[in-house]
Amino acid sequence: AAEKLFISQPSLSANVKRVEHHIGYPIFDRSTKPLSLTECGVQYIKAVEKIKSIQNEFEGFANDWGDLKKGTLTLGGSNLFSSWILPPLIADFARRYPLIQISLVEETTANLARMLRHGQLDLMLDSSVLDATIYSCRKFQEEHLILAVPGAFPINNTLRSYQLPVEDILSKKFLEESCPPVPLTRFKSEPFIMLKPENDTGKRARMICQNNLFEPNIILEMDQQMTSYNITCSGMGISFIGDIMLSKVPLTSDVVYYKLPACESSRDIRFYWKNGRYQTRAMEEFLKM
């Protein structure tokens, strides 16, 4: 046996005695020739074989997991991100790593942050600034808020030189210095459709109005940016809409668009994960996309 294991007989005997001392019972019956296993020895060998099998199975899983042949990835986003931004990223990731099981959760920012903190999500995509003591983040892209005004509002007739052609929004030409922001105070008497104050867009929109020395006439408060835009399209009121969303949805001639002051309307869209959370290979590869 020692020769088959490529070790000396004394070394093999010492190892056997060490195991017997550890378990408290003899493995071999030394009164027989050749040596035979005791009842305890038989069970010990079976247990060792099971342990070795489990170890080999896990090593196989770890090798597959490292190559992204197994694993899960749970993503979260608000209505805007889960509807328009995350699906093409998920589709691309699934093409590259078809054996990874992907889940997408659509919720409010507050609920997504709670789920992320409790380990129910791997990553969330959002425009809000979350607590850096709890969450880590990576910038995905920059977004710019635009003023969306129902085309039937008479105020548009006095602001034609500030109106943004759709192609300038899609090409981001409106970000050039040659394109001036609209004087926002001209809209102080108009009705606004705002997102709720706890939403980053709602919070930022109110700040923009306050910085322009007026309180907006809010007739409706919504939870989702897409909903507020649809209400603007119906002609009810003015909304603040991100250029990312406008690049994804069908634009309509029933709405007129205006540039807002850059320093107030620009923000980062970020992927967030919980501080101290072990980053799986699936998370790492998704963040590289």
Regions found by a protein language model. Name each.
Residues 89-92, 110-166, 236, 256-258:
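Short beta-strand-centered segments that line the small-molecule binding cleft or hinge
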Residues 85, 243-245, 254-289:
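A late-sequence structural motif
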Residues 155-157, 162-212, 279-280, 287:
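Secondary-structure junction motif
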Residues 108, 112, 117-120, 127, ...:
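Hydrophobic hinge/microswitch elements
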Residues 22-23, 44-66, 286:
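Alpha-helical linker/hinge and terminal dimerization helices associated
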Residues 9-10, 60, 66-114, 129, ...:
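N-terminal winged-helix
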Residues 20-39, 59:
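A short LG(V/I)-centered, amphipathic sequence patch enriched
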Residues 4, 17-26, 96:
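Residue cluster at the C-terminal edge of the helix-turn-helix DNA-binding motif
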